[in-house]
Design a protein with these regions (language model features):
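Conserved polymerase palm-domain catalytic core
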Residues: 1-157, 320-325
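Right-hand nucleic-acid polymerase module
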Residues: 1, 9-14, 153-326
């Protein structure tokens, strides 16, 4: 199966789908150039090598035959050209010159079964977290898919990240088996202990922003200005993706800010504009690009969306620049 995305919400959702369905082996991240045919050529090779366009029924038959199965995540990205400031990029954009770096980030995932992982010599199931066993696993994959990439266990590589978010694994609470069974920890359907959270950098930036909102309260003579600032800040907190790891972090941030306000002014924050946050939960979303679409169709869709988005951002930059000049 091939999944496409160009915003964090869709990308993180696809990765969570991989984790839920036990696609826990991953190849290194590939960064492919969209301004050449590099991305198209690589994806065509992967489709043939890993049978990515097979139906769910065909994939199921492979699993029954003790074969590994694969999925590909294709994430479209863009950024300012290296070495150029924001203004320089928009000036180039105004002249119809190349101003942005447009790339594809590609992730190959693999799902295996105990039957596939069974070592015929030792009659033991190979461990994905053992280095020597992982070499054997990759050899077994190579025998079925010649020229295959090297795969690693998802928990042993650098966290997959997207924008302000990174994939992490939550540890199960240290409770007795009886307590866990009472809460259906092991019997709950489609549950994964993987989630997304803010990166350390994003978390620290959000923490500092919260401190500024609290500390500026004293310097704002017009308290309505402080209230407006808080309202905007709370909306920003509520705008993060609603994964449990993120919600937990936002809750921690909010608690720290309430305590800071109390310590600084000896007054409850809720008496001065604070309110209970309404944090979202992730829901099933319909992807704007249909799964298993051809790469050419997916790229065309992304470029259309990108052009519209860049034009809007350019107009905002232009209006801001004109206002600054006046």
């Amino acid at each position: 199966m091939i999944y496409y995305s160009y915003v964090p919400k869709d990308f993180t959702k696809h990765v969570m789908g991989m984790m839920t369905n036990e696609y826990d082996l991953v190849a290194k991240k590939f960064i492919l150039n969209m301004n050449t045919d590099e991305a198209s050529r690589m994806i065509s090779k992967w489709i043939e090598r890993y049978h990515l366009l097979e139906t769910a029924q065909q994939t199921y038959r492979r699993r029954l035959n003790s074969e590994p199965v694969f999925s590909l995540l294709v994430h479209f990205t863009y950024s300012y050209l290296p070495g150029l400031s924001e203004s320089e990029c928009w000036e180039k954009f105004d002249k119809n010159e190349p101003a942005f770096l447009v790339q594809v980030e590609a992730y190959l995932f693999c799902r295996t079964s105990d039957a596939f992982l069974l070592d015929e010599k030792t009659q033991k199931v190979l461990s994905k977290t053992d280095k020597q066993d992982l070499l054997k696993i990759n050899r077994k994959i190579f025998e079925i898919c010649p020229s295959s990439e090297s795969f690693s266990y998802i928990g042993e590589v650098n966290p997959i990240s997207c924008g302000r978010y990174e994939l992490v694994r939550l540890t199960k609470p240290k409770k007795s088996i009886k307590e866990l069974q009472a809460k259906n920890w092991t019997n709950e359907k489609h549950v994964t202990d993987w989630t997304w959270r803010l990166t350390d950098k994003a978390y620290k930036e959000q923490l500092e922003q919260g401190k500024r909102v609290v500390l500026r309260f004293q310097s704002l003579i017009e308290k309505n200005a402080s209230l407006d600032e808080k309202k905007a800040y709370f909306r920003a907190l509520e705008g993060y993706l609603g994964y449990r790891g993120v919600r937990q972090q936002i809750g921690n941030l909010y608690h720290l800010e309430k305590r800071l306000f109390k310590d600084k002014y000896n007054q409850p924050w809720f008496d001065h504009g604070a309110r209970t946050l309404k944090l979202s939960y992730m829901k099933k979303l319909k992807s704007p690009i249909v799964n298993n679409s051809s790469y050419q169709e997916a790229e065309a869709h992304f470029r259309s969306v990108l052009t519209e988005d860049l034009n809007k951002k350019y107009e905002k930059w232009k209006a801001k620049s004109n206002k600054t000049e006046v």
